[in-house]
A protein has these predicted regions:
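Flexible beta->alpha loop and helix N-cap segments adjacent to enzyme active/binding sites
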Residues: 1-178
Length: 178
């Protein structure tokens, strides 16, 4: 399952990830998540419009292997509950031209700002979830396999629900949602 799911993510597909017990609260932390490839310039818009049925500009959060967080973000600390925000590492950013810097609003949002554009906000920040092998072994294994295939130890992670609905609880909910 890990191999096939990591390959589907690497191929640009959005995945409904359902494992173990359901999280309680507003964030999906790898138990009930919709996942995508953060390297894709189209993933943010695709997930928002075709999966979540919400405005195309709404940002997504990254799940990153704890041992690799400082490779992708200015952070080097634990954030297992997706509560902390930090900037994408400077060497992962793409410098904007003067013309791009002068853009405003939705036009600025459509500019690729980093190697992981699907989770990079306009100010280069992201709300990070660090994934630990000991506390979330299956999700960690998935991200590690994705890294093996792509060189990227980050995935897009958003709650497994559509606008106005609660996060899925049962397998039946998951099939109905996705």
């Amino acid at each position: 399952m890990i191999e096939q799911t990591a390959q589907a993510l690497a191929d640009g597909k959005a995945i409904g990830w359902f494992q173990g017990r359901m999280e309680f609260g507003p964030r999906s932390l790898g138990g009930r998540s919709i996942l995508g490839d953060p390297r894709s310039e189209k993933m943010q818009k695709t997930l928002n419009l075709k999966v979540k049925y919400r405005e195309s500009f709404r940002p997504f959060a990254p799940s990153v292997l704890r041992e690799d967080v400082s490779e992708w973000f200015e952070a080097d600390y634990d954030s297992p509950y997706m509560l902390l925000v930090d900037d994408v590492k400077k060497d992962k950013r793409i410098k904007m031209t003067k013309e791009e810097e002068s853009l405003f609003g939705i036009d600025k949002l459509n500019i690729k700002r980093s190697e992981i554009p699907a989770i990079t906000h306009v100010d280069y920040s992201a709300r990070i979830q660090t994934v630990h092998k000991k506390t979330n072994p299956k999700y960690h294994a998935l991200i590690a396999k994705f890294k093996e295939k792509t060189g990227c130890s980050v995935v897009v992670n958003t709650s497994f629900n559509v606008r106005g609905e609660p996060i899925v609880c049962t397998p039946e909910d998951a099939f109905r949602c996705f």
